[in-house]
Amino acid sequence: MEAKVMNATEKKELMGKYTKKLENAIKREASVMKEIENDKALIKYLEGQKTSGAAFDNTVYESYDAWIETIRKQIKKSESTLTNIEFKKVELEAIQKYIA
């Protein structure tokens, strides 16, 4: 089976459709930043609770430390998402120049 070779117009049309996907991913940036902010605030709160000796009342996590560690992992994932969004911005800019 022979692969079809796309002409320039077809390539630009395909890339134009891909820009919508990139734009939607980039729109998540503000919500990801807000998640990080909220997670950091929660860590401060939990550390304060732990330091004050407040009773641990949570059935999901074994301890304050386990809960805090889970949140730190979520922050790392969110920071990775922000890095990917920055790459998508560069990619979008390049595609927009290509299809212009």
Predicted regions and their residues:
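Amphipathic alpha-helical coiled-coil segments
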Residues: 28-29, 66-99
